[in-house]
């Protein structure tokens, strides 16, 4: 298989030898950066003997949906992914929900700083907040500035390759790791 995309509200059946990446970040009042990132990721080479990369995309194709279902899908699946990728698009929007998700997931996953990819596009007004929050929780600055969806895709692919070569797919879904639970969204 190599590469697959699962879009909300599709059920996710987590498999141990697969690398999962959640595309957290802005959805309202911004370009469909998830689509750009996914299209770029499709072009990378995935070896048949390597773990598959599965992208969880919270952006639905339809505009009207059950908000509770969306929040639950994101809540459970973010915690179960190997890679938490957060993208802050530029512009005036403060992205309060994204800031909450970032803080929550940094706190839950602080023992696994390599799990995080945090990218900020030029023009995002709360860059300093993102940097300080990340540094306070993880003890290091992992925020990348001057990013775009294509560069974000490169970071995701590089992290995927690192997990395949040196890490352990499924590592964050073990029940003894900060409460993460195998199985994701129910």
Regions found by a protein language model. Name each.
Residues 1-186:
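Conserved catalytic or regulatory cores that recognize and/or transform ribose-phosphate-containing ligands
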């Amino acid at each position: 298989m190599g590469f697959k995309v699962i879009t909300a509200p599709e059920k996710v059946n987590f498999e141990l030898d697969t690398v999962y990446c959640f595309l957290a970040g802005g959805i309202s009042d911004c370009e469909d950066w998830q689509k750009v990132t996914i299209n770029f990721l499709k072009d990378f080479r995935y070896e048949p003997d390597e773990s598959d990369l599965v992208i969880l995309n919270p952006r639905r194709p339809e505009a009207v949906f059950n908000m509770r279902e969306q929040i639950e899908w994101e809540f459970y699946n973010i915690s179960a992914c190997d890679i938490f990728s957060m993208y802050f698009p530029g512009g005036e929007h403060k992205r309060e929900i994204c800031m909450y998700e970032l803080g929550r997931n940094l706190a839950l996953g602080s023992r696994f700083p390599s799990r995080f990819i945090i990218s900020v596009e030029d023009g995002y007004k709360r860059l300093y907040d993102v940097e300080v929050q990340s540094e306070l929780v993880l003890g290091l600055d992992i925020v990348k500035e001057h990013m775009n969806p294509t560069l974000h895709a490169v970071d995701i692919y590089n992290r995927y390759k690192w997990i395949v070569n040196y890490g352990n797919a499924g590592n964050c879904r073990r029940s003894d790791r900060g409460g993460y639970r195998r199985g994701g969204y129910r």
